[in-house]
């Protein structure tokens, strides 16, 4: 966890189905499935150098993809990284196994503000990995940020075919719910139906959905307005792109992605070592 924190400081602390990989065959291999933009290859190389464990690495672009892959190939994936609400869903469906925190020397160093949350009391099944916020990204060479201080501003008809949205059902519904004045975490079916109707109105304005590398459409100039993670916005700014991240008046979308061990893991020991790395 210490080394993860060092390499993720710039992105986190600035707070499709893929074919299944070859699965681990012995205790010197770890099958690790993670979000696309999270990893630095140096970490995997360093982990292998220090532990002798080879990492078989694959990525996904949404929690739904992760869920479907584990439903299809639960046996063999060792370490995965679901978001908060999917931790509880996957736990309840028997897709995750308990984490042995006695094997995590760095657990005591974690920020207690992100521990023992309702989706996983006592962190029995998950360990916080990345904490961030999704806001409203504005390319200031293309748009005036003062015109985009609310999620509702994305519904302006003159924005047809101009927006980048996260490829994440929960996050996209969140902004529609907040536009309507509802909680982003509501379970009220009427409110969710209303949000769905709002999203249908928004769709003509959407050019692209991307959660695999959401900064890329901004970096390429394909879009200049839409949703973006704060870490991706910081990376774009570091490259000299005139991106301003606005936290709308209804609030940004806070989220936590978590290390978790699949119930079908072959190399549980290696998974613990990677979490603690």
List the model feature ranges, each with a label.
Residues 150-157, 257-277:
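Bilobed periplasmic-binding protein/Venus flytrap-like ligand-binding cleft at the lobe interface
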Residues 135-142, 178-179, 255-270:
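A bilobed periplasmic-binding-protein/Venus flytrap-type ligand-binding module shared by bacterial periplasmic
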Residues 81-205, 210-219:
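Extracytoplasmic ligand-binding site segments that recognize negatively charged/polar headgroups
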Residues 78-82, 207-208, 224-229, 244:
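Paired acidic/hydrophobic, glycine-rich loop segments that form the ligand-binding mouth/hinge
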Residues 25-89:
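Early extracytoplasmic/lumenal segment of secretory-pathway proteins
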């Amino acid at each position: 966890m210490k080394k993860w924190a060092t390499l993720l400081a710039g992105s986190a602390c600035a707070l499709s189905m893929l074919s299944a990989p070859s699965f681990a065959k012995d205790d010197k291999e770890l099958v690790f499935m993670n979000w696309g933009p999270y990893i630095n290859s140096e970490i995997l190389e360093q982990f292998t150098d220090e532990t002798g464990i080879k990492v078989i690495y694959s990525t996904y672009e949404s929690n739904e993809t992760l869920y479907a892959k584990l439903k299809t190939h639960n046996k063999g994936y060792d370490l995965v990284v679901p978001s908060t609400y999917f931790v509880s869903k996957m736990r309840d469906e028997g897709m995750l196994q308990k984490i042995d925190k006695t094997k995590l020397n760095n657990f005591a160093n974690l920020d207690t503000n992100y521990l023992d949350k309702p989706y996983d009391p006592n962190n029995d099944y998950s360990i916080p990995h990345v904490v961030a916020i999704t806001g409203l990204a504005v390319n200031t060479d293309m748009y005036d940020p003062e015109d985009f201080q609310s999620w509702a501003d994305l519904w302006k008809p003159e924005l047809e075919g101009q927006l980048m949205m996260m490829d994440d059902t929960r996050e996209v519904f969140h902004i529609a719910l907040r536009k309507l004045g509802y909680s982003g975490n509501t379970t009220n079916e009427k409110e969710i139906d209303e949000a769905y109707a709002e999203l249908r109105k928004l769709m003509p304005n959407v050019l692209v959905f991307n959660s695999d590398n959401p900064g890329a459409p901004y970096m390429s100039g394909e879009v200049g307005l839409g949703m973006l993670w704060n870490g991706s916005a910081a990376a774009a700014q570091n490259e000299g792109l005139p991106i301003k991240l606005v936290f709308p008046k209804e609030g940004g979308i806070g989220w936590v992605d978590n290390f978790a061990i699949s119930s079908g893991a072959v190399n549980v020991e290696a998974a613990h070592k990677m979490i603690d790395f």
